[in-house]
Amino acid sequence: MTYSKNVFVPVTNICRNRCGYCGFRREPGQPGARLMKPEEILPVLENGAKAGCTEALFTFGEYAEEVSEYRKWLKKLGYSSTLEYLLFLCEASIDIGILPHTNAGIMTRTELKALKPLNASMGLMLESTATLDAHKDCPGKLPELRLNTIREAGKLQIPYTTGLLIGIGEIREDRIESLEAIAGLHREYGHIQEVIIQNFAPKPGTPMENFPAPSIEEIIDTICLARQILPSDIAVQVAPNLIDPKALIAKGVTDLGGISPLTIDWINPEAEWPDIKELQRKLSPILLKERLPIYPQYVRKKWYSDRIGGLIEQLSDTDGYRKKP
């Protein structure tokens, strides 16, 4: 059972999408709306490196530049685009000794190509191939746009994370279709390292706050479907702060994602990360094994640039897992 140790950096929560279930997004002027400054981010990265974290998870609202106030904030920091700022943050992270993993919504091939040399892996939740009410005000949640980003990442040989969000109005057939779409892209490009099966958790103050959470039976069924449909070299992941993983391991879960000893889950701030030692005790006799944000098979295949190669080699053992510090 693998996991990575990360720091979670929510660079901005300004977003052009208005998902019915999202508690992360803010409008400029709302309490908590922000674009994090370098002086806020760099200490998080430095503390993460000291704590033995290997992954900097950079998250963004999607195409925040469509919001004029955000563009002003960015200009004030001295950057002309989100991409330019993100490239700076990735460079800083590498220099500090933490591997970047960027999740910033849909991206063009040009953006992916610019970020590839500075990221150990990247990610985008597919969520669902279905057209859902939850996404009615979300230009970036059109399934074909998301699948295209995942496809372009494959063409560029970027180790990639994607996943399904369960319980947002989709039906079982939609989940099957979503898993088949991911499997098809992986068979073509070989770049999907993990698929997250994430359970929807209702957030107060959102349009879907009274929507029922999916049952454990639905989650188990989806994990079983994932294991049947996805190629065997793709890890199936659940978040241990959102669901108890113990009963799910027998169904095919092989990874617990990024767990942070320092930062909260900014997307699900009500859900605390488990303590890694406590998690190991609960999961015994199954052993937890730490990995990097790039999975061992991609470390061994050297799917990374020279810019991050030295750091990956420094942090990984001969099998491509995290070297014991």
From Swiss-Prot:
| Signal peptide start and end residues | none
Q: What class of enzyme is it?
A: lyase
Q: How is the cofactor bound?
A: Binds 1 [4Fe-4S] cluster. The cluster is coordinated with 3 cysteines and an exchangeable S-adenosyl-L-methionine.
Q: Which cofactor does it need?
A: [4Fe-4S] cluster
Q: Which residues bind [4Fe-4S] cluster?
A: C15, C19, C22
- Tell me which UniProt keywords the record has, alphabetically: 4Fe-4S, Iron, Iron-sulfur, Lyase, Metal-binding, S-adenosyl-L-methionine
Task: Return the Pfam families for the record.
Answer: Radical_SAM (PF04055)
The EC number(s) given in the record are 4.3.1.32
What positions does the domain Radical SAM core occupy? 1-241
Q: What InterPro entries does the annotation carry?
A: Aldolase_TIM (IPR013785), CofG_family (IPR019939), Elp3/MiaA/NifB-like_rSAM (IPR006638), F420 (IPR034405), rSAM (IPR007197)
- Reaction(s) catalysed (UniProt annotation): 5-amino-5-(4-hydroxybenzyl)-6-(D-ribitylimino)-5,6-dihydrouracil + S-adenosyl-L-methionine = 7,8-didemethyl-8-hydroxy-5-deazariboflavin + 5'-deoxyadenosine + L-methionine + NH4(+) + H(+)
Top-level division of the source organism's lineage: Archaea
Quote the pathway field.
Answer: Cofactor biosynthesis; coenzyme F0 biosynthesis
Matches recorded under Gene3D superfamilies: Aldolase class I
Mind listing the GO molecular function terms for this protein? 4 iron, 4 sulfur cluster binding; 7,8-didemethyl-8-hydroxy-5-deazariboflavin synthase activity; iron ion binding; transferase activity, transferring alkyl or aryl (other than methyl) groups
How does it associate, per the subunit comment?
A: Consists of two subunits, CofG and CofH.
Fetch the PANTHER family from UniProt: 7,8-DIDEMETHYL-8-HYDROXY-5-DEAZARIBOFLAVIN SYNTHASE (PTHR43076:SF15), FO SYNTHASE (COFH) (PTHR43076)
Which NCBIfam families does the record associate with it?
Answer: F420_cofG, PRK06245.1
| Name of the protein in its database record | 7,8-didemethyl-8-hydroxy-5-deazariboflavin synthase
